[in-house]
Amino acid sequence: MAVGPTEGKQPPSESFSPTHHQIIAPSPILAVPTLAFSAAQVEIVCKTLEDSGDIERLARFLWSLPVALPNMHEILNCEAVLRARAVVAYHVGNFRELYAIIENHKFTKASYGKLQAMWLEAHYIEAEKLRGRSLGPVDKYRVRKKFPLPPTIWDGEQKTHCFKERTRSLLREWYLQDPYPNPTKKRELAKATGLNPTQVGNWFKNRRQRDRAAAAKNRIQHSQNSSGMGCRSRRADGAASPTPSDSSDSDISLGTHSPVPSSLQLQHSPGSTSNGANDREESLSVDDDKPRDLSGSLPLPLSLPLPLASPTHTPPQLPPGYGGGAGAGPGGPLTGPGCLPPFKLDAATSLFSAGCYLQSFSNLKEMSQQFPIQPIVLRPHPQLPQSLALNGASGGPPLHHPAYAAAYSVECVPGGHGPPHPPPKLRINSPEKLNSTAVAAAASVGGGGGNQHHEPTTTGYHHSGQLMLHRPFSTSPELKHSAPEIT
């Protein structure tokens, strides 16, 4: 016996009236209604729901899409659908699916901003969960370096100074045309670069400030370079200009700087034109064997040091009868006859007295190396008796003693008889000959006055009042009562 009614057959023992409804079992294919949406319609719906921010409805819509549709592959590869799926995965916390969607599909530049933000924020959230704290700027920078943007949502253009290189190049072009754009140009430039007018104005302000600083720095460098070139040119001119030290190798005359007699002109040999210092020193040698006329032409600094050459100082005078009395009056000129101290002139001292030194600071080093200045030592000599001083005191013996004449080669004739004689010509021998001959003269003349004791003084004057000047390191004999040297 049949339990239930068979399909298409009436039960044999029961009859149904025609008014009864037939029960039809539903087909499993027709259980869910089919959505006849095209790919364009699905894209529009996804964009609308994404822009509205209703993520739940967007998620339900994506879930309701049929899988067996013939155009399902085209719908799933649509950029709007992929972006909607990425937004839903980000909001539900399914970051693995978000990374897969972004890395495996190429997007256009219109989707770069949103997808880049979701990529970075997803990595920030994961890093915060791992570290258990919020991330700082440095931590976020490290995350960005560890997980760079994939090329599917990034064109590879680096950001420099907060702007892309393309934006900066466009701003530079506009800046070269007009560094002070008006608001209208700022708006146009902002529209062309994708920035706002405030950003454009700030960039122009910063660029103008940088240019002003660079211009000031360039001006300082230019002034320094010009001053350096001027110094070098002045040095070159100073080296090329004729100076008394290197003007002419044939004949160097010192008479143009100070009244030095022509007998002290530095004679150069014809072959002394080499550039070496030794040749120059040889060419500046002075003949020591010729008598020289040193009367009245030596400048004051050669005769006395600076403290003794003051106008208020009265130098020691000659006896009234010597040399016709020229320059012997009190307060008379120091350059008169007979006031020449016994010291030796060398090339360096002659150049110094002639004013060849310190012509300019540019050749100071070269001149000091070629002609070193030797100091003059003031040393009293009590071994010379009072009668043998060159400018002896009045009442002493005459100056024509044969031993004295042999020591100093002075042609001395007592004054006061006959016409005045020319100033004496002094031949200056070496310190050894001078001192030894002078000591012999003192022994022959002083004779019994050897026991006479002369008290040493601390000044540069001899006990007779005459200033004695000698070359340094002279070979004068050591005396018991000699005064200390004054340099």
Swiss-Prot record:
Q: Which InterPro entries match?
A: HD, Homeodomain-like_sf, SIX1_SD
| Positions with biased composition (Basic and acidic residues) | 278-293
Q: Name one GO biological process term.
A: dendrite morphogenesis
This protein's GO cellular component annotations are: nucleus; transcription regulator complex
The entry's localization annotation reads: Nucleus
A Pfam family per the record: Homeodomain
Q: Can you name one GO molecular function term for this protein?
A: DNA-binding transcription factor activity, RNA polymerase II-specific
Alphabetized, the UniProt keywords read:
Developmental protein, DNA-binding, Homeobox, Nucleus
Q: Where is the composition biased (Polar residues)?
A: 255-277
Where are the residues of the annotated region Disordered?
A: 182-330, 443-463
Task: Quote the DNA-binding region ranges, renumbered to this chain.
Answer: 154-214
Which intervals carry biased composition (Low complexity)? 294-312
Tissue specificity field: Expressed during early development of the head. First expressed in a band around the anterior end of stage 5 blastoderm embryo, at 93% to 85% egg length. By gastrula stage, site of expression shifts to the dorsal-anterior region. At stage 12, expression is found in the clypeolabrum, the stomodaeum, and in ectoderm dorsal to the future supraesophageal ganglion.
- For bias kind Gly residues, which ranges apply? 321-330
Cysteine-cysteine disulfides: none
So what does this one do? May be involved in head or eye development; development of the clypeolabrum and several head sensory organs.
Q: Which family is this sequence assigned to?
A: Belongs to the SIX/Sine oculis homeobox family.
Q: What is this protein called?
A: Protein Optix
Gene that specifies this protein:
Optix
